[in-house]
Amino acid sequence: SKIALDNLAHEIALAIRETQVFGVASKEATAGSSIFPTRGAHFDKNQNTSFVLFVDVDDNNKYGGPSELIETFNIQRRNYISEICGYATPSSNCTPLDLLDLTFTRPNPEPAVVGRVGTSEALYSYATITITSPKGISRNIVIWSNGQIAIQ
């Protein structure tokens, strides 16, 4: 239903926002280490009914697999991620992405927006994640370069 899709869009936006908060206000990895781990959210077009929150252990602004996993969010009710877009500039068109990593590093609330198409990787100004219901209703979660997260 439309309400369930709206709720899902808000859940995804909230998960990204929590990742942002934990990344910006993170504790030291080990007391006294002065190492503050980057946090991120990972979206994969081929895993379109889930997404991952992670700690960027190797500090490369992308998800490195199970050793970096914090939590996997499963998308319910046959809703799915139908499109992931990267935008090089605020006025550019969508570049459809295979993978998207949004990472937040203390003290900056602005995300690093890293997208991949095949083996080609690029930094983007901002990104959108489109979720779609079985009835074809869609919502966009927009992650702006200034750290704002919106639902359209």
What are these regions (language model features)?
Residues 1-21, 25-152:
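N-terminal helix-rich module
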